[in-house]
Amino acid sequence: MKSIAVTGYKNFELGIFKKDADEAVYIKETIKRHLIPLIEDGLEWVIISGQLGIELWAGEVVALLKEEYPIKLAVLEPFEKQSANWNENNQLWAQEVIGAADYHAFITKRPYESPAQFAARDGFIIDNTDGALLVYDLEKEGSPKFFYDRAKLAKEQANYFLECIDFYALQDVVEDMNQTF
C-alpha cells in the first residue's frame, strides 16, 4: 500500500474546540500508532482534505513523522477557500498543516458551491488512494459516515484497505499513556 487517506470527525463533533486541547494529544498519538506500522510496510503518502479536526491533527502527526520516516503529506482540499469562514486560529492551523505538506491542490478549482463538492472529494480521494484510516465509531454517526460508506463499498468491490479507529481504541491509548509504573 503506497497511499492512504486519513479522515474522521471534525473537532467540534467530538466536543473539542481548540487544536491543542488535551484530548488532541491522545487522538494524535492514536493516529501515529496506526500510521507507523503502515509506513514501515511501505506507505509513502498520507492524503487529507484539510478538514478541521482529525484531518488536521493527522497532518500534524505526519509532519512530525517526516523527521524519522520517508512519508509524504498531500492536502487535497475539496474547493478553493475552504477555510475562508473559519475563525483566525483555525485558518492558521490549516495554513500550518498545508505549509508542512509535500503536495497541495484543490479537487474542484472554484470556491464552495454545493455539498456535491464534498461527495466529489470523497470519490476522488478513494479512487486515488489504496486505503483509508478513519477515526470513526459506527455507534456515533457524524460527518465521516459519508466517506465511510463509500470506502466500505470500495473495500467490498475493489479490495480497498479500510481501518476504523473507534472510541474503544482511543480509550486504550488514553489508558496506556496514563499508566504509571
UniProtKB/Swiss-Prot annotation:
Q: Which family does it belong to?
A: Belongs to the UPF0398 family.
InterPro entries documented for this protein: YspA (IPR010697)
Q: What is this protein called?
A: UPF0398 protein lin2003
Classification via SUPFAM superfamilies: MCP/YpsA-like (SSF102405)
Show the NCBIfam families listed in the entry.
Answer: PRK13660.1
Q: Which organism is it from?
A: Listeria innocua serovar 6a (strain ATCC BAA-680 / CLIP 11262)
